[in-house]
Amino acid sequence: MVWLYDRYVVPWLLNCVCSASPIVHQRSKIVPDAKGRVLELGMGSGLNLPFYDRAKISSLEGLEPSEPLRRMAQATAAREGLPVEITPGRAEALPYPTGVFDTVVCTFTLCSVQDPAAALAEARRVLKPDGRLLFCEHGLAPDGGVVKWQRRIEPVWKAIAGGCHLTRPVAASIAAAGFRVERCATMYLPNTPHWAGWNEWGSAAPA
């Protein structure tokens, strides 16, 4: 029964949660900055696709481990008329050569990868020396009272939301993986419980 839930319910649930208006608005703040050859980690159902600036990107590739979500993303790409190559795989072991992407886009993905440090190290590896990581992630809140609730809720949340963690630091993890965080804005998302709503977004360059 668990595999049925993970295969059929979790993709639908993630698509619903990640298409909430406050989250979509956050996507619109960073995705248009992508340029050149672009890799999106954890493409999901393709919710970022409408925000890519076609005048800036030369090609778009996406990595997504979930087959149902890959199908959704292909359908979204077809509706948008946007060519994209979506590959199955895990962010911790990217099937790409070193130093080939101008931009890596990572939105609401680091919360659910098995090893965020390895995923970020791989993102750094596949970026060109002058490339950029564009990120928009939810994670560990700065307020102690909120963190207490995040830690209480996280075990149940992980079980029902495809392994999504609530207490992973965002910008600090990116810096620890060998990036120089160039800009980072933060806020609690509106109309979202604080335990799920702490958001950090910006850009980082290989250090």
Residue positions per predicted region:
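Conserved alpha-helix/loop element of class I SAM-dependent methyltransferases that forms part
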Residues: 17-37, 47-51
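Conserved beta-strand signature within the Rossmann-like core of class I S-adenosyl-L-methionine
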Residues: 130-138
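Short alpha-helix
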Residues: 162-178
